[in-house]
């Protein structure tokens, strides 16, 4: 290689003075190698190195990261700690491994200790097995089973039917009397007439009239007993018979059956004297030669004449003997207030008269027609709107000639009525065609009715007579207020009232008569103020009556 020519003023002694590095000629000695050496900058021979080598204070050294240092002997060392977790351990800066049986260290290698039925096949742990143990299609250890065993729930179980069953996890025979266990053997408890024969079979001991016929127990019979349809019967003839599965004796009067036995029904004049039937004679009668004769002295107005007992009748006694049988009768003047009724002389009473409790003639009191139907003056909670007995209702109907004047008021007691949210609330009453109260009639939402336990009847003082059998005269006229026309004005009356009696809470009050499809009905409807207690003061209404 031809060397470059130096400038005349170039000083070849390092370091070069004031020359542009690019102008310095290549003057590397021919003995310098490019392996580990380089000319950098140009004209300067230097070491060629990469990380982690570097220079420090003109000396070649190493770049040291965290945990590395050079000790005083110039050796590279580390003060970094190695963190380990179980089963790896670190003792005196030596990393180890914790293990327990069946793991073991053999020839500096970790191995597994095992016993039968385990085995190692092709460097894999295997299990020696024989039937019924097997490996199923899912490579799971399984058990070959057959009935009565099953493993549907993952547990090997024994299927059993009565009389076999599990008791305290033990297969047992289930039994009840007369079976019992005797020295762990199932035994039959027997009592006479059962017994064990010589061949250990259960036999029946019997004696006449029982007998064995065609290997069946039967009964020897003689008259009056017979066997029919497998039943023992008793042949009977009158007066004996079988009634209600009991032997009975047929009797005709005067015989009868009592708790103590057969008896005779004795009428007047007959009696029992010891064990004999005798005639019971009263005063004036006697037995003479086996016949009944009179034994009396006749006192007036009776007389005994010609073997006959006779009655003497005066001409002014109002008594007469009439008819073929000569019956004694009273000669009553029926046009003068007397009459014969049920063989008794009675007084005939005209209008306005009656017999009092002492049997005396008295003037009949004037009949008073009820004029008021009501729920009493102060009822208990008696109406149901949203829940049972959630309100108290005062309803009064007063009959006045051809009109009824009525009033109604309501006091909320509980539930929804204390804070109602509906637009309107109604109270309805239904009546049958005879004007009697109709209970359990279906109602719609936001409608109330009297509860079945409520009192409704004619006013009787401050209470009510609930014996109302006909109250048509109190009902709305079916001509003036036709049925099923409750939505038409002819059946309505409309006015206003004040909720809770507060003049600042005016609400509408509507009365509708005979809105139901049959019978009679009353319906009262009020507008609701939202969440305001539904207390309605006394509201008046009137209508034309049926009668």
Swiss-Prot record:
Function, in words: Forms spikes that protrude from each vertex of the icosahedral capsid. Interacts with host receptor CXCAR to provide virion initial attachment to target cell. Fiber proteins are shed during virus entry, when virus is still at the cell surface.
Lineage of source species: Viruses, Varidnaviria, Bamfordvirae, Preplasmiviricota, Tectiliviricetes
Species this protein is from: Human adenovirus F serotype 40 (HAdV-40)
UniProt keyword Iron, yes or no: no
Localization per Swiss-Prot or TrEMBL: Virion; Host nucleus
Similarity-based family: Belongs to the adenoviridae fiber family.
Gene3D superfamilies: 6.20.10.20, Adenovirus pIV-related, attachment domain (2.60.90.10), reovirus attachment protein sigma1, domain 1 (2.10.25.20)
Record GO biological process: adhesion receptor-mediated virion attachment to host cell; cell adhesion; symbiont entry into host cell
Domain observations: The tail region anchors the fiber to penton base capsomers, whereas the shaft, built from several repeated motifs, allows the knob to protrude from the virion.
Keywords: Capsid protein, Host nucleus, Host-virus interaction, Late protein, Viral attachment to host adhesion receptor, Viral attachment to host cell, Virion, Virus entry into host cell
Statement: the UniProt record of this protein carries the keyword Lyase: no
Official protein name in the record: Fiber protein 1
Swiss-Prot/TrEMBL induction comment: Expressed in the late phase of the viral replicative cycle.
GO cellular component: host cell nucleus; viral capsid
Quaternary structure, from the entry: Homotrimer. Interacts with host receptor CXCAR. Interacts (via N-terminal tail region) with pentons.
Note: All late proteins expressed from the major late promoter are produced by alternative splicing and alternative polyadenylation of the same gene giving rise to non-overlapping ORFs. A leader sequence is present in the N-terminus of all these mRNAs and is recognized by the viral shutoff protein to provide expression although conventional translation via ribosome scanning from the cap has been shut off in the host cell.
